[in-house]
């Protein structure tokens, strides 16, 4: 039996820890992810996957279908053109201060017998140099682990979760160590490194073993930098559920916030979407005892984007995924520019973005997902900025005080 502790005492302790740890971060993180560049995702660049046929549903199967030579040629062209220094200049002009760059284990510590092609680290090197030139900071994000830590296509290979089986954790540590050695030593541009993106605890990842892995990654960070911040994804466990773990060690939590991946969310009113974002800030971010950022989030209010749930998989909004009841037809929400949405949809997207900015800046900031797509309304920051839907300056509000903080 544990003694009962008053809620007031718990809150007081939590707020003290929050104030103490939050003081270690000098400025708010206001960043954007470079998704779909060095780790492919079908919904961000559907053309790459359509050209490869139906069997190409993730980076693993894409490279497997194409073969080494053709895959290397196509991916090299993609890496050279999808993100360039001009993007970094535009990101800086928008008032952002961070870029989070996903990278897969296969780029840092490839495994024999797998079809992935390499060469990504040279482009990550370029990205760090471009960031430095434009006064941006970098979060290097280990986005995919051997066996897949979540079963999502953005881990490199969709399907069953196989991470923590066999020697996959040890292989992941090797990949992480390679990244830490390459990017943390003698560099003040890469100020954060993420241990692993979205390990899926509710999906079967063992949280105690995940904590052990996080401890191992911290040791690798400290071997290369006394000051770099280790970013820990919450594993889809409420962020404050990690309270008491690895406090006071330049460690920061990362939580991701989307309101489209559960069936009922696609039918929510804009008011309910806004309330959910505000509640995340008010209840969960404020309760964490370490600095915390929302490392992925979106302006999208539906899951209509083509391939968002996976290539060959349906959509909740239109009722083609599982037993979800249709909310309506996706229409212009599926692809193209945010400018193709109705006036009400554009206004609601702006409202939703502003509410999230307010909520997430209650703590240490945010990193929007993502900078660029081939046409995904609400997800593409470059498109949102060009159409006046993402605030400029970032503090501008057409819908102020939505959260009543």
Curated annotation (Swiss-Prot):
Disulfide bonds join 278-403, 304-330. It is found in: Secreted. One of its GO terms (cellular component) is extracellular region. It holds the Pfam family Cellulase. One of its GO terms (molecular function) is glucan exo-1,3-beta-glucosidase activity. Its EC number is 3.2.1.58. Residues 1-26 form the signal peptide. One of its GO terms (biological process) is cell wall organization. It comes from the Eukaryota. The active site is at 198 (proton donor), 296 (nucleophile). Keywords: Carbohydrate metabolism, Cell wall biogenesis/degradation, Disulfide bond, Glycosidase, Hydrolase, Manganese, Metal-binding, Polysaccharide degradation, Secreted, Signal. InterPro entries: Glyco_hydro_5, Glycoside_hydrolase_SF, Glycosyl_hydrolase_5. Its cofactor is Mn(2+). Beta-glucanases participate in the metabolism of beta-glucan, the main structural component of the cell wall. It could also function biosynthetically as a transglycosylase. Belongs to the glycosyl hydrolase 5 (cellulase A) family. This is Probable glucan 1,3-beta-glucosidase A. It comes from Emericella nidulans (strain FGSC A4 / ATCC 38163 / CBS 112.46 / NRRL 194 / M139) (Aspergillus nidulans).
